[in-house]
Amino acid sequence: MAKFLAHENVPSVAVEAARRACVDIVWVRDISPGIGDDAVLALAQAEGRILLTFDKDFGEMAFEQGKTAAPGVILLRPRLRSPDHVAKFTVALLNQPIDWAGNFSVAQEGRLRVVPMPA
């Protein structure tokens, strides 16, 4: 079962909903609020967690800067950004039988792109 690290920009209701759905998820805001993106990646790597974020910078860090982007990254792109909608979208996404490890995934409503992380 995959483990996830939710970036600070993921709404608290989405993190709480994922926890209620028995998803192993840690929220950056709970453990290290305010840390920079490099530290977020290091934390995800150290704990073996897939990063869940709205921040496109993590794609740039992985593909253009060659930084290790954790065990994997899921870039959330739901149609609506209301916290309740994001919560439902996130829980439905994380409960899919997908191997997130080693991939950069872009999740949109009705579309999921999964690209292997650069070596």
Cite the ranges covered by each PLM segment.
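N-terminal first-folded block
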Residues: 2-49
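Acidic, metal-binding active-site segment of PIN/NYN-like and related structure-specific nucleases
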Residues: 44-62
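Short, glycine/charged-enriched secondary-structure capping and boundary segments
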Residues: 18-21, 40-41, 65-68, 89, ...
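Charged phosphate-binding loop/patch that engages nucleotide di/tri-phosphates or the phosphate backbone
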Residues: 97-119
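Mid-chain, well-packed structural core segment of small domains
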Residues: 59-93
